[in-house]
Each structure stands twice: as structure tokens, then as C-alpha cells.
Amino acid sequence: KNVEGNLVNYENLDNLQMRIHDYFKFLKYGYDRITDWCCWHIRRGRMNREESIKIAKEKGGKYPSTYLKVSLEKILNEINCSEEKFLEICKKFTNPQIFRCDNQGQPIFDKNKNLEKINYDNISEK
């Protein structure tokens, strides 16, 4: 089974905060470890761009509610942060040029606290 937020089962296992780090990378820049792995597979000829976009859309950027079977609440407790505060920080650093936002410019989270990118292939819509 793959590690949450990754395509493999052996990467980023050194501490539980790695998943939070990868999630903030997604919020700020629109890509995460899954995208990194897809790019590596494309460069090695193991996957094409269309497959990569599909995988990144399905598996990438998911809210880090658990990591390695540990709840986000427990991970955040270790750094003295509540999930409410974590969500505030997420909203503050979410790039509105990459993710769908409401009329006030606030990111729109679904019922699972996931965001929707405006464009998954990072090519401007015509």
C-alpha cells in the first residue's frame, strides 16, 4: 500500500510532519510528492503526461487527515497546534491563482477539506 500523499510506500517516513510539509507545498505551488513522482516517471519513460495528470488529480493534494495511520490531530498536538489553527494557516497560504475560491477570495474546501485546482495541467485555459 502506498503512503498517503505518495505513489510509493517507502518515501518520507522519517517523521510525521512530512505530510504536512508536502500539503503546504501543494497549497502554495499546486503540486506535491505525487506530482514529483509522476514527473520522475515521465522523464524515465514509464508514464505519459496524460496518465500523470489523471493520477495527480485523483491522488494528489488530499487533505492530510492521517499519515502512516496517525491522525492529523495527534501530529498537530506534537507541535502544539489545533486543527482549527492548521486550517486557518492553510487558508492563509493557499494560492488563489491555483485553487477555486469564493467571492471573498477564500479557498473553497469540499466536505473532506480538499481543494479543487482551477486547472490541473497548469496550461492556461483558452
Predicted regions and their residues:
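Nucleotide-activated chemistry modules centered on ATP-dependent adenylation/adenylyltransferase
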Residues: K1-K126
